[in-house]
């Protein structure tokens, strides 16, 4: 339709020229040129025929003509088409993007066939493993629906190959989080062609976007975020002031925290993904068309247009939390409900300022070379201009020293408040010493006068005051917290002392004679493992001992010796000797072991825990009174038995005790008493258990009947399989008398077992 209107206007101009008469060839050419100049620059070059003075070979095509001039004409024409409300048609987009990418690759003299073989080879490079892991993590988070779900597995494989190919192409950038979203949209436009998608990614990241946009800790991205805040303050001053107010309020309410600029959270995501995660797909493609032709400043323009559209609802927010909640809701509405119309958005983008954006290059240069996270204090404004230039250059050249001082102050914790003035004084001396050398060096202000504006000192003063206030508040908060913790610990310590001093001391137990070890409260309720270190430091007070104390002996060694299988077998064998002589009782070793009482076992364990040194001490019943003297023997009376002397002499002859025990005879009354219910009494270990410990003086106690501890089964003969007891044989009494069976004796079996036991023991002794 535009072509018909334009052709009709030209025909009417030709008829007017005919009515005016022949004015010569010059008049005709001048009129034609005037008509051509009236053609809007926002419309593409069209096919014009049947007019005198117009080149009939001038045609508009999707492919540029040969030569640099032909490409420039094609570029200008497509740039004008991109500015239209309809934008570049969907059918043209793939061809247009590929033409731009091919021209860039040709300009840098790239052999594309060789590049394809290198980037898409099947062999794994050393750097592919780490990048491949991160790529796979991000594949499932790709926002495009065509790459989600199990049915899109093949599409994700293609996406991974494209991302890995670009990482191989540009190793300085590698893979950055967010590339998966860019590559997914490019693959959608390229209809899944891997090579074409790689071309577009190379052109977009290496040519269109600023250098180091995705490398060097996203430095160029940080620069654009700072530039955007200045542009927001310039174009939307009311909204910018409102956001600054919310930020200051949040800083005051946080109690020493620091609230970043409120726009950073959203603009960073917009810049990294080029609005692919916050706007509909058709709007994003129009924005990308403009980015390919106009450059990266379109990103800043679109961000300003979005904030201008959302400004009315944002100005109603009264707190930073309310702002974040509102922006979360608006972002979802922009993506799903077309809150922003694409033609209105692009019209705002192109009409807000002429191209290129005024002061954009200066602002980028300023923040690129003057990003100081912790700048030095600004001196008074009465200093001369030359001195001010030197200060600016010093701020730019020395951020590392300032960061080092800031980190050193922050790492000192509560003491940083005392050392901060000294560090600042030291920093000031260093700067004054290097001031003359800095005056002679080159200055960024001399290289680019527009990079440093007139309000630089005010800006730095405000920024320094904010950072110093934040740092001081943090230190004061740490001091207060440290003092509260220290005071609380002191109060708890006083409470422990008060509770320990309550009530008179009535009695002192032997376990309280020594100071108890410190136990972590987290280990309460768990069984404490006894080590040799604790046993070595322990001293036991024994009333019956002559000295009142027993020297510490390693508990684990004594316990191991007493519970060894061979010593258990010897003890059982010694018990069987009197029974063998009298031909009474059961000769089965297993039956004797089963008859041992559980109460004796419990009391034995209690005695071992109470006396960890492993010594056998004099046992006192609950009804006994007083402590015996160290030299004599203390009688012990048990209900139902006659008093038995307990030898308390430390120099007792162990061999004599063994002879007496071996000569001890057990009668029929003792065997019958085993089947009756027995009363368990606290018992001590037999003196023979300690008889084999060489070089030690021990206190022996006479063994009570039925009070031996339960010991494991042991056979001196080597056996592949251990002896197993049959339940039927036990019920028949083959293993000795039990509660279910009468007291039946087998003399022949007992003789055989005893003879074999005696023979084995004698052989073992040899």
UniProtKB/Swiss-Prot annotation:
Biased composition (Acidic residues): 393-404
Gene Ontology, cellular component aspect: ciliary basal body; cytosol; nuclear body; plasma membrane
A Gene Ontology biological process term: negative regulation of cilium assembly
Gene3D superfamilies linked: putative rabgap domain of human tbc1 domain family member 14 like domains, Ypt/Rab-GAP domain of gyp1p, domain 3
InterPro entries per UniProt: Rab-GAP-TBC_dom, Rab-GAP_TBC_sf, Tbc1d30_C
Any one Gene Ontology molecular-function term assigned to this protein's record: GTPase activator activity
Polar residues biased stretches: 751-766
Coiled coil (UniProt feature): 422-491
Residues modified to Phosphoserine: 642
Region: Disordered, residue numbers: 380-406, 603-647, 731-766
Paired cysteines (S-S): none
Residues covered by the Rab-GAP TBC domain: 87-295
Keywords: Cell membrane, Coiled coil, Membrane, Phosphoprotein
Membrane protein topology class: Peripheral membrane protein
Protein localization: Cell membrane
Function: May act as a GTPase-activating protein for Rab family protein(s).
The name this protein goes by in its record: TBC1 domain family member 30
Origin species: Mus musculus (Mouse)
Encoding gene, per UniProt annotation: Tbc1d30
């Amino acid at each position: 339709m535009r072509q018909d209107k334009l052709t009709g206007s030209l025909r009417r101009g030709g008829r007017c020229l005919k009515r005016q008469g022949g004015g010569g060839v010059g008049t005709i050419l001048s009129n034609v040129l005037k008509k051509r100049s009236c053609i809007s620059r926002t419309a593409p070059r069209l096919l014009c025929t049947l007019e005198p003075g117009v080149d009939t070979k001038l045609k508009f095509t999707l492919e540029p003509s040969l030569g640099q001039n032909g490409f420039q004409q094609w570029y200008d024409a497509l740039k004008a088409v991109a500015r239209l409300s309809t934008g570049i048609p969907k059918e043209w987009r793939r061809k247009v993007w590929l033409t731009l990418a091919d021209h860039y690759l040709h300009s840098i003299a790239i052999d594309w066939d060789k590049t394809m073989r290198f980037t898409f080879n099947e062999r794994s490079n050393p750097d592919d493993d780490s990048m491949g892991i991160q790529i796979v993590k991000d594949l499932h988070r790709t926002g495009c629906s065509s790459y989600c779900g199990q049915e899109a597995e093949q599409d994700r494989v293609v996406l991974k190959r494209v991302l890995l190919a670009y990482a191989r192409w540009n190793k300085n950038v590698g893979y950055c989080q967010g590339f998966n979203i860019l590559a997914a949209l490019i693959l959608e436009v390229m209809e899944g062609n891997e090579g074409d998608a790689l071309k577009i990614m190379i052109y977009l990241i290496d040519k269109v976007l600023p250098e180091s946009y995705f490398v060097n800790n996203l430095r160029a991205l940080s620069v654009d975020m700072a530039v955007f805040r200045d542009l927001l303050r310039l174009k939307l001053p009311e909204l910018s002031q409102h956001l600054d107010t919310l930020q200051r309020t949040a800083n005051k309410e946080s109690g020493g925290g620091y609230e970043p600029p409120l726009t950073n959270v959203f603009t960073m995501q917009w810049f990294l993904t080029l609005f692919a995660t916050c706007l509909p797909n058709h709007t994003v493609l129009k924005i990308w068309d403009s980015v390919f032709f106009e450059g990266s400043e379109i990103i800043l323009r679109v961000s300003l247009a979005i904030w201008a559209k959302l400004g009315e609802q944002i100005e109603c927010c009264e707190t930073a939390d309310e702002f974040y909640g509102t922006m979360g809701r608006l972002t979802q509405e922009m993506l799903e409900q077309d809150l922003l119309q694409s033609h209105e958005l692009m019209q705002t983008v192109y009409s807000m300022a002429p191209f290129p954006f005024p002061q954009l290059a200066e602002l980028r240069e300023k923040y690129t070379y003057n990003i100081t996270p912790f700048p030095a204090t600004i001196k008074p404004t009465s200093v001369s201009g030359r001195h001010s230039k030197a200060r600016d250059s010093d701020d730019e050249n020395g951020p590392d020293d300032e960061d080092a001082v800031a980190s050193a102050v922050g790492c000192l914790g509560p003491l940083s408040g005392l050392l901060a003035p000294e560090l600042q004084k030291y920093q000031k001396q260093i700067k004054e010493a290097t001031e003359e050398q800095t005056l002679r060096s080159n200055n960024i202000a001399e290289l680019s006068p527009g990079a440093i504006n007139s309000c630089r000192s005010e800006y730095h003063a405000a920024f320094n005051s904010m950072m110093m206030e934040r740092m001081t508040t943090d230190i004061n908060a740490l001091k207060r917290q440290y003092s509260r913790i220290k005071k609380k610990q002191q109060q708890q310590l006083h409470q422990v002392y008060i509770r320990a001093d309550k009530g008179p001391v009535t009695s002192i137990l032997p376990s309280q004679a020594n100071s108890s070890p410190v136990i972590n409260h987290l280990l309460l309720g768990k069984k404490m493992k006894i080590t040799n270190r604790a046993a070595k430091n322990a001293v036991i007070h024994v009333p019956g001992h002559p000295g009142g104390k027993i020297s510490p002996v390693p508990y684990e060694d004594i316990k191991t010796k007493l519970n060894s299988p061979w010593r258990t077998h010897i003890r059982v064998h010694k018990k069987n000797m009197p029974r063998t002589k009298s031909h009474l009782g059961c000769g089965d070793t297993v039956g004797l072991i089963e008859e041992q009482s559980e109460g004796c076992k419990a009391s034995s364990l209690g005695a071992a825990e109470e006396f960890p040194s492993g010594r056998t001490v004099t046992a006192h019943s609950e009804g006994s009174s007083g402590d015996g003297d160290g030299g004599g023997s203390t009688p012990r009376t048990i209900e139902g038995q006659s008093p038995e002397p307990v030898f308390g002499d430390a120099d007792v002859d162990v061999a004599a005790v063994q002879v007496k025990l071996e000569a001890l005879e057990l009668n029929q009354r003792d065997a019958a008493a085993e089947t009756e219910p027995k009363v368990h009494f606290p018992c001590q270990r037999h003196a023979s258990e300690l008889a084999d410990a060489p070089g030690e003086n021990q206190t022996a106690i006479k063994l009570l009947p039925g009070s031996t501890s339960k010991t494991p089964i042991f056979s001196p003969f080597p056996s592949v399989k251990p002896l197993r007891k049959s339940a039927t044989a036990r019920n028949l009494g083959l293993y000795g008398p039990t509660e279910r069976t009468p007291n039946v004796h087998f003399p022949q079996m007992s003789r055989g077992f005893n003879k074999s036991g005696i023979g084995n023991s004698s052989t073992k002794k040899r």
